[in-house]
Structures are given as structure tokens and as C-alpha cells.
Amino acid sequence: MTTIDPARTALVAVHLQNDIDGAFAPFFRAEIDRVGTLATAARLLDTARVAGVPVVYTRVAWRRDYSDLHANSPLLNIVIQQNCLVDGTPGAAITDELAPQDTDRVVTHQRVGGFHDSELDEVLRGAGVDTVVFLGVATNASVEGTARAASDLGYRVLVVSDACSAATPEAHTASLESLGLLAEITTTDELIAALSPQTANTTT
């Protein structure tokens, strides 16, 4: 992996929400626990903050009656069936283990991809960011959709393979293989190593 400039990079944590990957989440928790996604994400989030890399969480949430949910896909129909991700409820909040810090930003949206009808692009450009690093859930849905949009918007895109997960390892792997055409696929250890000189300078 080439170098990372923390002054021009943001770490975007996709859909780390209680109803999606919390302890009692109906969607992806089994695979998250199997591969340790949340612990890996925590390491990366902590390192990014120390290195001065802005952290942005994207979260998806709808009104209680889902009047703002356009259920044009099986995934979004499941949201209604499960009666989850209602704005203002604990389930729509960021996963308890990975709660945002005071310096982090949280962007809420209503579609699968984080850029659609949201302030995400504005937040990133306002911070002088041209490189976006993605982690989160699910690799083959919201992570991939948001990463593809970031590429189309002109950002350099990195996806941290071991800080993402999907419902199955096969879905996760297939998504990363596809994303490799548009993004740099890296690992938490590689990214932490790339940030380590900046981390050392920040803490000395």
C-alpha cells in the first residue's frame, strides 16, 4: 500500500449500528463474531483518531412509520419486516462498543449507499479530504455501494478487508474482488503501519 496523508484522509465507518451488528442484531452478528470485525474496527478507529484522521460514521435510519423508506429492494423490505432501524431508538444508534467520540461526525441517510441524499460528500470535502478509507457492514451492500460512489465522486478509495464483514464469507470475498477494480483493498495492520509515523509524531 502506498503512503497515507492523514491530513487528506478520512475513515468512514459504515452502518456500525445496534440493529445491524449489535449483540442482538438479526442481520450479520454471527459472521461479525466469527471474524472479530468489531474488535478490528475498534483498533483502526483508535489509531485513526490518534493520527489525526477524521472519523465519520454513516448510519441509516427511518421514521417510525417508514414513510421515508423507499422499499425497492429485498434488503430494504427486510428492514420493514424486522421493524428495525427506527430513528431515535437504541437499535438505530451506533453500536455500543464503537460509540463515536466528540471529534467524530455522524451522517444519517435513508438509502443503501451513504452518499445519496446525505451530507457525506460535503463533510468530507469540507475537511479537505481526497482519500477515504472504508470499514463496516455489510461488505457487499452498504460498504460496496458507498465505496463505489466515492470512486465516482473522485476520491481515492481504500477498503479495509478485515474490518468489514457480510452475512457469509463468500459474499464478503466476492465483494472485495469486485471492489478491487475501483479501490485499494488493504488490511488493518497495513493501514496502522502506514499511519504509525504520524501516530508516533502525534504522541511525542
Where are these regions (language model features)?
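Active-site acidic carboxylates
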Residues: 1-101, 195-204
